[in-house]
Every structure is written in structure tokens, then in C-alpha cells.
């Protein structure tokens, strides 16, 4: 499993709250057990909430997960990686993103692309 934490807010991110953080080992284990092979993310945790984005690959499909949450649940609790919501390539994913969303995942996208994912 490839895991990459960008470790900072994306340059053009409009919502910057909390402190940059990492996924917990238990959260990584849950994602691994879901069959995810690649995880690229940035995440920030505040007092009672968190924000972030995850670009991940499962069963040869790319997914975007919004890691934002309140104190009622954590950053991966509501993850939905349905095959109907995935993209067969990074190119297809980029074409489907709004400009605003792409700004928040651009460093993750660029790293995945650099790692020779398609």
C-alpha cells in the first residue's frame, strides 16, 4: 500500500482551519482492509472538526474522498468507494473535477501522476 501525506494545506485551498495532521494507524488499517492500494492525502484537525482531501485507488478505480468532519465522526468514517463513483484514470478524474475541487487535490494528483499512475 502506497501512502503519501502532503503534510500542508494546498496553495489555493480556501478553507484553512486546524493543524496539519496524519491519519492514525488504526485508520490506515481500516483503509487497507477496504482494499485500497494507494492513498494520497492532506488532513488538518481542529478542536472539534477536521478538513482534508484524499485521492485513493481501489480496484483500479480512482476516488476522491472529502475528509472534512465534525466531532460526530472521524475523517474516514463516511468513506464511500463505490465502483459507480470511481474513475478509470487520473485523466478522467481531472476532467470530472470542478476547478475549485481540483485546487484542493492538485498536489495529490501531481504526486500520483509522478508516481506513474494513470
Where in the sequence are the language-model features?
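Intrinsically disordered, low-complexity regulatory segments enriched in Ser/Thr/Pro
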Residues: 58-92
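Secondary-structure boundary elements
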Residues: 1-4, 23, 32
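Compositionally biased, intrinsically disordered low-complexity regions
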Residues: 9, 20, 48, 52-54, ...
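Residue-level marker of intrinsically disordered, low-complexity segments enriched
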Residues: 1, 18, 34-37, 74
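Amphipathic, interaction-prone secondary-structure segments
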Residues: 25-69
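Low-complexity intrinsically disordered segments
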Residues: 1-18, 80-118
Amino acid at each position: 500500500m502506497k501512502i503519501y501525506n502532503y503534510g500542508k494545506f494546498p496553495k489555493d485551498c480556501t478553507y484553512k482551519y486546524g493543524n496539519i495532521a496524519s491519519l492514525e494507524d488504526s485508520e490506515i488499517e481500516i483503509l487497507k482492509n477496504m482494499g485500497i492500494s494507494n492513498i494520497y492525502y492532506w488532513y488538518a484537525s481542529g478542536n472539534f472538526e477536521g478538513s482534508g482531501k484524499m485521492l485513493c485507488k481501489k480496484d483500479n478505480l480512482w476516488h476522491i474522498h472529502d475528509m472534512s468532519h465534525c466531532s460526530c465522526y472521524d475523517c474516514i468514517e463516511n468513506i464511500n468507494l463505490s465502483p459507480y463513483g470511481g474513475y478509470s484514470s487520473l485523466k478522467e478524474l481531472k476532467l470530472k473535477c470542478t476547478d475549485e475541487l481540483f485546487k484542493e487535490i492538485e498536489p495529490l494528483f501531481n504526486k500520483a501522476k509522478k508516481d506513474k499512475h494513470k
